[in-house]
Amino acid sequence: MRSLPWGNAKKLGLTPYQVVIEASLIEREAAFPRDRVRVARVLDNRLKARMPLEIDATVEYALGTWKPVLTAADYKIKSRYNTYLYPGLPPTPIASPGLAALRAALEPAPGNWLYYLVTSKDGHESFTASYSQFLQWRAQQAAG
């Protein structure tokens, strides 16, 4: 853990504890190294823009169960962990982040992305700054 660039936390506007919280979100959201650093950038961009993080894993954490598909009612759960309803980071980590997730949180990829979605069968995510592009991907996903 000492080999991590903890000095970057301040540059990102985060405390070390907030880095751990963010890394826990990355741990639950991104399966691949390339995606981890991009998810980290999305989180940082959304925090800076004061946008809701809208992380499904935080809703699952609030529900106390991991689900393949969340329902409309799930997204309305009143919990500080629900990043659809409450702005900013959740109050505590939602998982135990690994070193790769911590490093991603401290060294996010450069980019202006605000949205991401799993768009490939192997679980890789696509990233965009465009809400209309994000909606298009969701529609394609829903269509099968």
Which residues are covered by each model-predicted region?
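Bacterial extracytoplasmic/cell-wall-associated proteins, especially those involved in peptidoglycan
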Residues: M1-G144
